[in-house]
Amino acid sequence: MDEPDDAARAGRADARRNRERLLTAAKAAFAELGADVSLEEIARRAGVGIATLYRNFASREAILEAVYRRDVEDHSASATRLLETMAPGEALHEWMRRALNYAATKRGMSSALASITDGSSELYAYSSRLYVDAVTLLVQRATESGDIREGVDPMDLLGALGGLAHGVGRADWQARALRLLDILMDGLRYKQPTLRPAPE
């Protein structure tokens, strides 16, 4: 074997592991301590030096964006994984439950996220596109299987999720939001359509 090549591969693998450790540590630190947590604290939790953190992320905003981007990608991709193991209607329900649970976990970094995901940002457009694609797939499959009624607009479901997430932070929010989601899903399963047409 070519030893320099082996060393280079090992170095790249170490770099990937360090980046993943930093992202995992940052997510937990932001959730527990808020978006103002020190970068030194994130590095300490990840078990790396502050120089390693800065080699991967130039600023607090950069690591916050990377955490958010990874979470959005993981949650969006879970739509396909859920469809492989659940009936389409249950997959849709579970995906929406996870969306609400994620809203609860990111509460500590919500103010900082607002500054990097405003309506005009590339990151906002990117995350919106992934979510729209995921819920569109789930609604399509659940409609085709007969698990939910016809005529459901995926954008309505995303809007409903946004409304349910609005009260995050209240003591009873999560239990109440999940109950309301169950009611919403019961309505989607009701087969006598009373829906107004989706707006053009």
Residue positions per predicted region:
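Basic, helix-initiating cap at the start of DNA-binding domains
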Residues: M1-R45, A62-E65
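Amphipathic alpha-helical segments that line or abut small-molecule/effector binding pockets
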Residues: T24, G89-A104, D133, L178-D186
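Amphipathic alpha-helical packing segments from all-alpha helical-bundle domains
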Residues: E73, G119-M155, G159-R170, A175
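Short linear capping/connector segments at secondary-structure termini
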Residues: S111-S121, P197-P199
